[in-house]
Amino acid sequence: WITNPFEPHITNGRLYGRGASDMKTAISSFMVATEIFLEENKFAFDGTISFLITILRRRGEAEFGTKSLIKWIKSKKKKIDYCLVGEPTNPNRLGEMIKIGRRGSINFLLEVLGEQGHVAYPEKADNPIDNLEKIFKELHKPFDSGSKRFQPTKLIITSIDSSNFTSNIIPGKVEIRFNVRFNDKFNSQQVINLIKKRIKSVTTKYKLSSKVSGESFFNYSNILTDSLVRSIKTVTRCNPILSTTGGTSDARFISEICPVVEFGLVGKTMHKVNEMVEIRSINKLTKIYHQFIKNIFLKNEFNK
């Protein structure tokens, strides 16, 4: 780092620090935008603007943070009409992309079982590695060709491990870890069932465990999306792409209670050394959020 990552530092028109692009600055921009809006409309505003800000969001299996907050909102029967998440959705320039949905995600651990033995006597052992080629062929069969809103479901193998560090022992098992990113043609249980079916077509000697990170979701609210698109066009003159690509986000939890879209800064440096954002982008984002709030709450603005 050229600066202390935990102390914001401005140099050459850029703000450096951990979270500068993902996504602390977006929170600050929305707060300033809200302050400006309330000053302008303090006698005409009868809605509610809330900030959902959490900590420990990435600890464990996302049990804390947003997920817990959504449980609390449900328990209190609080009604939320719309939500905007300030994720850094833009690949290269501000105004380029809005996320209006996300693919679902499941992590799998497959243990293919065999019988350990000496390599000199393969007839007395059962090498689980021998089945891998057939298993991989089954797992990599296409799930679908995509949908109207999403790209095709995709399986990616991330590791293969027999825990065998010698060259003269046939392993008793081999572990394969893989992830499936699935579209709106499936729910998580359907994906799990299909994976089991494909493995069983090759072998019954296996164990399979899975962890669902989130279901796929899509925002069907025209008002929410249109309000944000108009705001971006007004400030940047860009016509944003409406996208469902990329990884999971906390919007997957929020989608359980209300329509949600995601828009923030450029994400080129997020999670990297010297994470930064241009000051002019922060100012533009604040203007976009300000216009978005007006579009949502002031009918005369939305109907322009």
Stretch-by-stretch model annotation:
Residues 13-14, 18, 50, 54, 81-83, 154, 243-245, ...:
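Structural motif
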Residues 14-29, 118:
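Glycine/serine-rich anion-binding loops at beta->alpha junctions
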Residues 23-101:
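Acidic/histidine-rich catalytic neighborhood of metal-dependent amide-processing enzymes
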Residues 4, 11, 26, 104-106, ...:
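Activation loop
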Residues 88-93, 100, 106-304:
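Metal-dependent amide/peptide-bond hydrolase catalytic core
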Residues 1-18, 38-45:
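Acidic/His- and Gly-rich active-site-bordering loop/insert found
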